[in-house]
Each structure stands twice: as structure tokens, then as C-alpha cells.
Swiss-Prot record:
Pfam families: FAM124. Interacts with CHD7 and CHD8. InterPro entries: FAM124, FAM124_dom. This is Protein FAM124B. It comes from Bos taurus (Bovine). Belongs to the FAM124 family. The modification Phosphoserine is found at residue 49.
Length: 461
């Protein structure tokens, strides 16, 4: 018995307006059923409210669609099959892609004498080609601007963890799935100099990755978590990318907690090719959070900038994606996009309380498996960041470990003397001292009396 190949590492998500998801999903399934019945590459999700896209006039530079899907079908499998696919593309809801732009000028020569179709102006364009030999191919092509082509090859090779199967001066492709009769390819095509890319806002490429912590610092744009296992970013030309983390407790992911807690990391964090250990990753996050504290990175999962620089939003910050099956997924939860590092500085007991409370609220969070379209749990608003901490931390009181860390009469006496000396200080000094006690005495062994006196003298200096 022949072993079935592993599922492809890439999935294409298409975002449809409310009420159109089921129709578009059925249309794609019927089209691809005779080509690749074993895999479901295209998944349609619905938005809760329609989105308006504002196109800018580009009089000096021609615009080219950022994504296309080409079907290479063999002639010897029957003309009826080929005619059936072509006939399906010529009926509603398919629309013929115009060969001229708004100014009446023809599109670049790449589309010359070729017919393309689309389900929406913000979805990929589709085309059919005949092949005489070899396997049938479904090729998802990303068109890259002239200057970004080489960088795009390195980016997708890093995400896919493989080299390009074939690479030429202006074209390359990766084989993501193959059988004896069918192959799935992701290809990159370099556009002529002076041609800009028009990214499709309703199209998202999702890739399965094993680790997100070592990948995030090497991405060209900020990467933000939009759910427990999914992170969103974009490539050099503005195409949306989803990174789906394969949870594995052996890789440092505990209770679904992402190993990288800062969602606004960019390519300037680490040099290309560097690797991080958990300790160095935490230190890097702390240093970067200090550097960008005054900088305002306002990146959401559905608000991405146009090539012209003006952000185009797919909706409000509370826009929900709803799959064709009727379930919903938050596309840009504002409270999820900014994970915090404060739990790293708590003593073990307090951190367990924080994680326990976070996990209890995560059970109420709506998480939709976009691969199946089913909502895993019910949706409830997440609590504020301050409410996640124990009450003793909310009121700036030291944790309970301080009351039990001192034992014996000598320790009690030193504690009374210490409190008497601290009492006349202003409130700010008391708050700072409390913070020192939390950081120094809880997670570390109890210091000797000499060290405690040195700490007191240093504090008063």
C-alpha cells in the first residue's frame, strides 16, 4: 500500500463578505474536485461586515495583481474535463479579469493573450493552461516587485524550511505537495522594473511552522499574534501571511503560551541567521521593549498599509472572521495583539496564579480552527490586563512569600528594625523598596545579615 504524502504546509484563506462564504467555498470545491480531490487548499471565511477598498490612482506606474492561481491540465486525460473547467470559470460567481486598467492601457505583457478569472477584485486571479506531458500542477504565484524578488525567495525559503525546487533569474517555485499525477507549487515571479504590486487584501497565505520564536526576529515586518496558535505578518510586497504554530511541549511551548511574547518584533532585532536561546530571547525582548517604548507601532491583524503608505482597514478593530460553516474568529483582537512580559519578573507562586487565571480566560476566548471552520469554544470578552494579576499585586502589596520567608527571632527583629528605618521615607521610596523586596527575596535564597545591611545602606545613599 502506497503511503499518502503529508498534507501541504500552505493553505490559502479567502475572506468573503457575509452571506457569500458558502457559495464561494462550494464553487472552489467543485472546480478543484477533479484536479486535487485529496487536499483542500482553499478555505473561505466570512467577515461580519463588508469592507470597502479604496484604490489610489497610479498614473505613472502600472499595477499588477499580487497573486494568481494557474491550473496546468493534461490534454490526454480528456477534452471534456478541460472544457468543464473552462466552462465553470465563465459562469457566475466567476468574473472575467479585465485585460485593461482604469486608464484604458493594457496590462503588462505577462498577462498578454491570456484569459484570467476572479471571484472578487481582492482575491487571486485564476487561469487554465494545457500541458502535454508530466504531472498536472496547481501553481500559486506571488508576483514580486523588481527590487524585492531576491529577498522574497529567501523569506519563503526560511518559512518553508526548504530551498526552491527550481530557481531562475526572474522565476522560481517550491514544490509543497506531490503525487504521481499532481503537484502543488508556490512560485515567485519577478515583475518588470517600474511595475508595482497590487496585494490582494482578501487573500491570506497560511504556513505551518514548528517554531515561531526564532522566526519572528528575521521577518521583514512586525509579526503579531491573532490567536493562540496563529501569528500574522506580511512579505516585502504587502501580501498577508499567517504562521500557524504546531504546538509541541518538547519545544518549549507550555499551556499554549507562545515562546516569543512580544508581537511587535521586526527584522532589526537580530542579524540574519542568528539563533536564540530562551534566556537570550527574553533579554532581547526586554532591551527592545525599552528602545521602542516611545515608538508607536500600531499593527493589527486586518489593518495593513497600502503600497502608497495609507493604511487600509478591513473593518474596525473588532472585525470578526466567520467561516462558511457559521463560526467566528476574531481577526484583530486588540487585547491579544500586545502580550506582556510582566509575568517573567514574578516569583514562581505568583506566576502560577497568573498563568492559571490566563488559562481560565483563554477557555472563554473564541478560537476558530480555520482549517475546519468550527469554533472550538464560546466567545467572551477578555479581561483587562490588570485584572489578570492577583489582588495583592494589583494593590502594590508584596506577595505572601515575604511573610513566610523570615523565620526565627533574629529575622523578626531585623525585620522590625528595617521597617522602622523605612517608615520616615516618602511613599515613592516605599513603593520602590517593595519592588526590590519582590525581585530579590522571593525567587532567590534569603541573604545573610551582612548583605541585608549593605542593601539598606545602598538604599539610603
Amino acid at each position: 500500500m502506497d503511503e499518502m504524502p503529508e498534507p501541504p504546509a500552505m493553505t490559502v484563506h479567502l475572506l468573503a463578505n457575509a452571506g457569500q462564504g458558502l457559495l464561494l467555498q462550494q464553487t472552489l470545491d467543485q472546480l478543484l474536485d477533479c484536479i486535487c480531490p485529496d487536499i483542500r487548499l482553499f478555505l473561505v471565511s466570512e467577515r461580519a461586515s463588508p469592507v470597502k477598498y479604496y484604490d489610489k490612482c497610479h498614473s505613472k506606474r502600472s499595477r499588477f495583481p499580487g497573486m494568481s492561481v494557474l491550473l496546468f491540465l493534461k490534454e490526454n486525460l480528456g477534452e471534456e474535463r478541460l472544457f468543464h473547467v473552462l466552462d465553470s470559470l465563465q459562469h457566475w460567481p466567476w468574473q472575467c479579469y479585465p485585460t485593461q486598467n482604469a486608464q484604458g492601457r493594457p496590462c503588462p505583457y505577462i498577462l498578454a493573450n491570456q484569459e484570467f478569472y476572479s471571484l472578487d477584485s481582492q482575491m487571486p486571479i485564476w487561469g487554465v493552461r494545457q500541458v502535454h506531458c508530466g504531472t498536472e500542477i496547481l501553481r500559486v504565484t506571488l508576483y514580486c516587485s523588481f527590487d524585492n524578488y531576491e529577498d522574497a525567495i529567501r523569506l519563503y525559503a526560511m518559512i518553508l524550511q526548504r530551498e526552491a525546487t527550481l530557481q531562475k533569474s526572474n522565476f522560481c517555485f517550491f514544490v509543497l505537495y506531490s503525487t504521481e499525477t499532481f503537484a502543488l507549487q508556490l512560485s515567485l515571479k519577478q515583475l518588470p522594473l517600474g511595475t508595482s504590486v497590487d496585494p490582494k487584501e482578501a487573500s491570506v497565505l497560511q504556513f505551518k511552522v514548528q517554531e515561531i520564536g526564532q522566526l519572528v526576529p528575521l521577518l521583514p515586518h512586525p509579526c503579531v499574534p491573532i490567536s493562540r496558535t496563529r501569528w500574522q505578518t506580511q512579505d516585502y510586497d504587502g501580501n498577508k501571511i499567517l504562521l500557524q504554530v504546531q504546538l509541541n511541549p518538547g519545544l518549549g511551548v507550555r499551556n499554549g503560551e507562545p515562546p516569543f511574547l512580544n508581537g511587535t518584533l521586526g527584522a532589526d532585532t537580530l542579524p540574519h541567521g542568528s539563533r536564540l536561546t530562551p534566556v537570550s530571547a527574553i533579554r532581547t525582548l526586554e532591551l527592545r521593549s525599552r528602545r521602542i517604548r516611545g515608538r508607536r507601532f500600531k499593527v493589527s491583524s486586518v489593518e495593513l498599509p497600502e503600497p502608497g503608505g495609507r493604511p487600509v482597514s478591513d473593518g474596525s478593530s473588532n472585525t470578526w472572521w466567520k467561516s462558511a460553516g457559521g463560526s467566528a474568529q476574531p481577526s484583530s483582537p486588540a487585547t491579544e495583539s500586545q502580550p506582556q512580559l510582566s509575568s517573567l519578573h514574578l516569583e514562581p507562586g505568583a506566576r502560577m496564579k497568573v498563568l492559571g487565571r490566563e488559562n481560565s480566560f483563554e477557555k472563554l476566548e473564541a478560537e476558530t480552527n480555520v482549517d475546519t471552520g468550527f469554533t472550538m469554544v464560546s466567545s467572551e470578552p477578555r479581561p483587562s490586563f490588570a485584572s489578570r494579576f492577583p489582588r495583592n499585586l494589583q494593590t502594590h502589596q508584596p506577595p505572601s512569600c515575604l511573610s513566610t520567608s523570615f523565620s526565627g527571632s533574629a529575622a523578626s527583629k531585623n525585620n522590625r528594625i528595617f521597617k522602622e528605618r523605612v517608615h520616615p521615607l516618602p511613599l515613592a521610596g516605599q513603593r520602590d523598596l517593595g519592588a526590590k523586596k519582590i525581585l530579590s527575596k522571593c525567587p532567590l535564597p534569603l541573604p545573610v545579615q551582612g548583605e541585608a545591611k549593605e542593601a539598606e545602606e545602598e538604599f539610603f545613599i
